[in-house]
Design a protein with these regions (language model features):
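Phosphate-binding loop of NTP-binding sites
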Residues: 46, 119-254, 260-271
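Anionic group-transfer/hydrolysis microenvironments
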Residues: 66, 78, 104, 141, ...
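Cytosolic catalytic headpiece of P-type ATPases
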Residues: 104-108, 148-149, 219-222, 297-298, ...
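Short, charged/polar "capping" segments at the starts of alpha-helices
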Residues: 104-109, 256-261, 283
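Short, ordered loop/turn segments at secondary-structure junctions
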Residues: 2-3, 103-105, 168, 219-221, ...
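N-terminal leader/targeting and accessory segments in enzymes
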Residues: 1-124, 287, 311-317
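Adenine nucleotide phosphate-binding catalytic loops in nucleotide-utilizing enzymes
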Residues: 7-14, 26-34, 55, 78, ...
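Structural signal for conserved beta-strand scaffold positions within catalytic alpha/beta enzyme cores
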Residues: 76, 101, 114-115, 139, ...
């Protein structure tokens, strides 16, 4: 934008615009996808949550004031019947640290963190929490037995270190990211339940969880109305294999009709397969089962070892 330069007693006509043209500078501007922008935006919020003293007592996310705990951060998710914005006063009254919302709200301004989209924030925040965890992660799916197995694994792992377990049956597109939001650096293990009612859901959820160890309990007819056949359900449950960390493990029920089908999928991804079941070829299988009134005594072969267990009368597969 200069038109001249003064040199000693001379005025020299000059155009920096023309100079720049001669340089033939090419600007390569890399466009950031909208998803990446949202992720970066949420990352900034996450960094704020970590650094700000006010957030150090942050204890997970909540989308339901009925189950909200003190120091939770409340997200105003809009559902079919209700909009979370209506419940902001109740959330704060119950002790919510902050409110995450996309709405312009002047009231409670010091407690509001504005985001572009609440659902995206929930998923991206869960992903960031997973990024910052060094825990060994388990993800359990299957047509039946998920919740009871999750609770049993939790009880066992507690003996070896601090363990986080997803509450109740938090296994859907809200429950899984909410569970991940409570994972912290003190946790040595994390146990998560992953459910589905249609194709693609387990893939999306396990992208967030990224388990070291995946478990498929069985393939049954639950949600068969959304699939052509049982093979479709096996494919949907098998989506967990896509997101098991490289070099990880898949635990499969050898007695299930889709054992070999799922095993092949896992081997293609270089995932180690550990089998269990009543079939004697299983890596883990019972040699002797003695059922009593209240307890069951089991003699179990695990590889080359024999283990004797006395358990309550629960599902032997668990």
């Amino acid at each position: 934008h200069e038109t001249e330069q003064i040199y000693k007693d001379k005025i020299i006509a000059f155009s920096d615009k023309e100079v720049v043209k001669k340089l033939k500078i090419t600007l390569k501007i890399k466009k950031i996808s909208s998803k990446k922008k949202i992720y970066l935006e949420n990352k900034k919020i996450f960094e704020k949550l970590k650094k700000d003293k006010k957030f150090r007592k942050f204890k997970g996310l909540s989308i339901d004031t009925r189950t909200l705990k003190k120091k939770n951060v409340f997200i105003t998710i809009k559902g079919k019947n209700n909009d979370g914005v209506k419940f902001i006063p109740e959330a704060l009254k119950k002790g919510a640290s902050f409110i995450i919302t996309s709405k312009n709200i002047k009231k409670f301004e010091n407690k509001i963190i504005k985001v572009k989209n609440e659902n995206n924030f929930l998923n991206n925040f869960a992903s960031l929490k997973r990024d910052n965890s060094n825990a060994k992660i388990f993800a359990i799916t299957g047509s039946a037995g998920k919740t009871s197995l999750k609770n049993l694994i939790h009880e066992l792992l507690k003996n070896f270190g601090e363990t986080y377990c997803s509450p109740k049956s938090y296994n859907n597109h809200f429950g899984v990211p909410l569970s991940l939001s409570s994972l912290n650096k003190n946790h040595k293990y994390g146990v998560f339940e992953v459910g589905m009612s249609k194709k693609g859901e387990i893939n999306n959820l396990t992208k967030l969880v990224r388990p070291h160890i995946g478990i498929i309990t069985n393939i049954g007819e639950a949600h068969i109305e959304n699939f052509k056949n049982l093979r479709g359900i096996a494919d949907a449950k098998g989506e967990i294999i896509n997101n098991i960390i490289s070099g990880g493990t898949l635990i499969l029920n050898r007695d299930d009709n889709y054992f070999n089908y799922l095993k092949k999928k896992a081997i293609k991804r270089n995932i180690k397969v550990v089998s269990y079941g009543k079939d004697k070829r299983s890596y883990v299988h019972p040699i002797q089962i003695s059922k009593g009134k209240d307890k069951t005594k089991l003699k179990v072969k695990v590889g080359n070892q024999i283990i004797i267990l006395s358990i309550k009368n629960i599902n032997i597969y668990n």
